Swiss-Prot record:
It comes from Salmonella arizonae (strain ATCC BAA-731 / CDC346-86 / RSK2980). Zn(2+) binds at residues 641, 643, 665, 726. This is 5-methyltetrahydropteroyltriglutamate--homocysteine methyltransferase. Gene3D superfamilies: 3.20.20.210. The gene is metE. It catalyses: 5-methyltetrahydropteroyltri-L-glutamate + L-homocysteine = tetrahydropteroyltri-L-glutamate + L-methionine. The lineage of its organism: Bacteria, Pseudomonadati, Pseudomonadota, Gammaproteobacteria, Enterobacterales.
Length: 754
């Protein structure tokens, strides 16, 4: 039985972020719909050809998405919220963008769908909305059109579909409460229709993604898989695809399904290959996810060979990435500035395809010479002085419980802070960043390219900071920020100033919609050679009598939004970062900065997928934050910010952070996230976000007042702050001014009403 290679998906954005640029040009009215669609066709054709040339036997089709693949599935099923629907019920690409960006067909503002993290990754999806009695029908044929494209190009393909049970699991009920699982029988006919259309096209295998099968699911949801796949069986061969964890706990459910193959993630799961082989039906294909789709490290191919070789020839076998390569940059070969030694440690999406081909050839032939040669740099790295820093390791080993304790409890600190800052009721602030204008980005780019000397660069950044302070004082905000003009990304900026990180030129990965990030890579022990934020924070504070927040990205977020080392634990990395940033807190405080924000938007996303594994993660995640913050004196107010979060199940840990103020993203959920804080009786101060910064819509004063009044029904008004949902980096100045003016006005109105 010959082993084949396949991938579960490939990066969509293009090596030069062509998709992002085309989307934003279209949204700005500078490109036609056909021009946008042409970019998509070009990218798909290029990516299929690149994978094929790299050695992939069966190409994924349907992994491309204009915004995210869950939203694509919603359109496929005709699941369009009423506020975004065309009058005639038709669906087009503008419908998709309206759901993601918040517009009605008339062009008027309409709340965007809620956005949240895709399992425990830094990718996002638009949450499907379900209502009682909802109808579904095939309305969006993107998958079928792309299958036709790939077949016309002569490729051997494997269409990709998000499975029906996972799709329902990822959604939320809107309106009258009901069990959304009851909709399964209503969406299955659409899936049957799609599979029938694929069968007509001669498709043999369909990859149907059910990552919910790695979770600890209620029994009713486990039972739903049998109902679903009994209905879907028979038209094509189904490769039931899981990832991000192992399947062994739910294997009894899986082996009862009428599918023809199973993909398992052998990187992030603890499944034993021999046990899987013994328990799976003998005629099933096993797709082994042996190459990490979520990191950038070169694979130890001899180890992968040994992991799978015992079952070669005993059952049908494919080798694949652990998950979609969506989470990896595209091509290492264009990284011309990386040090040669460090570069030899990495593999991006195309190189991972090559690794799969090497592994396939070795398994088919029994000749391991090529895989051994490929993995030689891994052995060298284990002894590199660039990886190990004895001073950092000693400091980490010396941590005591006292290092994670503030001097006094919140009640004592709050009194000292009130006396120091004398803020009004309903204090107003922003989350940190202001619009990153073309001028700001150009300034940074010119400096990075060497076209601008340091003095001119610093003068330019100082002027943008000065303007940000002027804007905030003009608006009447109470606690100011410097605007972060010097920062391209909240994680990359800190990584650039910490030892132990390296950066790529083109290592972009998609976060959501058109937003891409370029995560740093943790290659060694982490330390802070010099202060990072102090100079600009001190300068901003010198321009105003109002408090200016120092802005730090927290240790867990830096960890989660970087590509981490794989030779030490995530806990070790987080605590190394915490110690480095603890010194930054002390330096900011010494420079006269009285309010310091330590952003931890990724705390929840780092949770293991199985609840039984949560406690250990939360214990070290909270400890890392507290180590970072505990250098602050009582009168220094520590803020933290979180977004895209469901807090109900981690409230103990949120409280254990012991931040003086937490700001959270709540506007898209209509303040429902505050229910968690109310039920828990959260003791510290809270800033519930009052408008959605991911949408260009400007909220009215009345809208903001209504949200704040709703918040005050759950949290005492004296402990409430007023702020946007998130940073304003991606917005333009006109809507930023308008939105903040309305926010400040709403706060003033509420003060006057008291």
């Amino acid at each position: 039985m010959t082993i084949l290679t396949h991938t579960l998906g490939f990066p969509r954005v293009g090596l030069r972020r062509e998709l992002k640029k085309a989307q934003e040009s279209y949204w700005a009215g500078n490109a036609t719909r056909e021009e946008l669609l042409a970019v998509g066709r070009e990218l798909r054709a290029r990516h299929w050809q690149q994978q094929k040339q790299a050695g992939i036997d069966l190409l994924p089709v349907g992994d491309f998405a204009w915004y995210d693949h869950v939203l694509t599935t919603s359109l496929l099923l005709g699941n369009v919220p009423a506020r975004h629907q065309n009058n005639d019920g038709s669906v087009d690409i503008d419908t998709l963008f309206r759901i993601g960006r918040g517009r009605a067909p008339t062009g008027e503002p309409a709340a965007a769908a809620e956005m949240t993290k895709w399992f425990n990754t830094n990718y996002h999806y638009m949450v499907p909305e379900f209502s009682k009695g909802q109808q579904f029908r095939l309305t969006w044929t993107q998958l079928l059109e792309e299958v036709d494209e790939a077949l016309a190009l002569g490729h051997k393909i494997k269409p990709v579909l998000l499975g029906p049970v996972t799709y329902l699991w990822l959604g939320k009920v809107k309106g009258e409460p009901f069990d959304r699982l009851t909709l399964l029988k209503d969406i299955l006919p659409v899936y049957q229709h799609v599979l029938a259309e694929l069968a007509k096209r001669g498709i043999e295998w369909v990859q149907i993604d059910e990552p919910a099968l790695v979770l600890e699911l209620p029994q009713a949801w486990l039972d739903a898989f049998k109902l679903a796949y009994d209905a879907l069986a028979g038209q094509v061969k189904l490769l039931l695809t899981t990832y991000f964890e192992g399947v062994t706990p739910n294997l009894n459910t899986i082996i009862a399904l009428p599918v023809q193959g199973l993909h398992v993630d052998l990187i992030h799961g603890k499944d034993d290959v021999s046990e899987l082989h013994q328990r799976l039906p003998a005629d099933w294909l096993l797709s082994a996810g042996l190459i990490n789709g979520r990191n950038v490290w070169r694979a130890d191919l001899p180890e992968k060979y040994a992991q799978i070789n015992d079952i070669v020839g005993k059952r049908a076998l494919w080798v694949s990435s652990s998950c979609s390569l969506l989470h990896s940059p595209i091509d290492l070969s264009v990284e011309t500035r990386l040090d040669a030694e460090v570069k030899s440690w990495f593999a991006f999406a195309l190189q991972k395809c090559g690794e799969l081909a090497l592994l396939r050839d070795a398994l088919n032939s029994g000749d391991t010479a090529a895989v051994t040669e490929w993995s030689a740099p891994i052995q060298a790295r284990r002894h590199s002085t660039r990886v190990h820093n004895v001073g950092v390791e000693k400091r980490l080993a010396a941590i005591t419980a006292q290092d994670s304790q503030r001097e006094n409890p919140y009640e004592v600190r709050a009194e000292a802070q009130r006396a120091r800052f004398k803020l009004p009721a309903w204090p107003t602030t922003t989350i940190g960043s202001f619009p990153q204008t073309t001028e700001i980005r150009g300034l940074r780019l010119d400096f990075k390219k060497g076209n601008l000397d340091a003095n001119h660069y610093r003068t330019g950044i100082a002027e943008h900071i000065r303007q940000a302070i002027i804007e905030q004082e003009r608006l009447g905000l109470d606690v100011l920020v410097h605007g972060e003009a010097e920062r391209n990304d909240m994680v990359e900026y800190f990584g650039e100033h910490l030892d132990g990180f390296v950066f790529t030129q083109n290592g972009w990965v998609q976060s959501y919609g058109s937003r891409c990030v370029k995560p740093p890579v943790v290659i060694g022990d982490i330390s802070r050679p010099a202060p990072i934020t102090v100079e600009w924070a001190k300068y901003a504070q010198s321009l105003t009598d109002k408090p200016v927040k120092g802005m730090l990205t927290g240790p867990v977020t830096i960890l989660c939004w970087s590509f981490p080392r794989e030779d030490v634990t995530r806990e070790t990395i987080a605590k190394q970062i915490a110690l480095a940033l603890r010194d930054e807190v002390a330096d900011l405080e010494a420079a006269g900065i009285g309010i310091i924000q330590i952003d931890e938007p990724a705390l929840r996303e780092g949770l293991p997928l199985r609840r039984s594994d949560w406690d250990a993660y939360l214990a070290w995640g909270v400890e890392a934050f507290r180590i970072n913050a505990a250098a602050a004196k009582d009168e220094t107010q520590i803020h933290t910010h979180m977004c895209y979060c469901e807090f109900n199940d981690i409230m103990d840990s949120i409280a254990a952070l012991d931040a003086d103020v937490i700001t959270i993203e709540t506007s898209r959920s209509d303040m429902e996230l505050l229910e968690s804080f109310e039920a828990f009786d959260y003791p510290n101060e809270i800033g519930p976000g009052v408008y959605d910064i991911h949408s260009p819509n400007v909220p009215s004063v009345e809208w903001i007042e209504a949200l704040l009044k709703k918040a005050a029904q759950r949290i005492p008004a004296q402990r409430l702050w007023v702020n946007p949902d998130c940073g304003l980096k991606t917005r333009g100045w006109p809507e930023t001014r308008a939105a903040l003016a309305n926010m400040v006005k709403a706060a003033h109105n509420l003060r006057q009403a008291e």
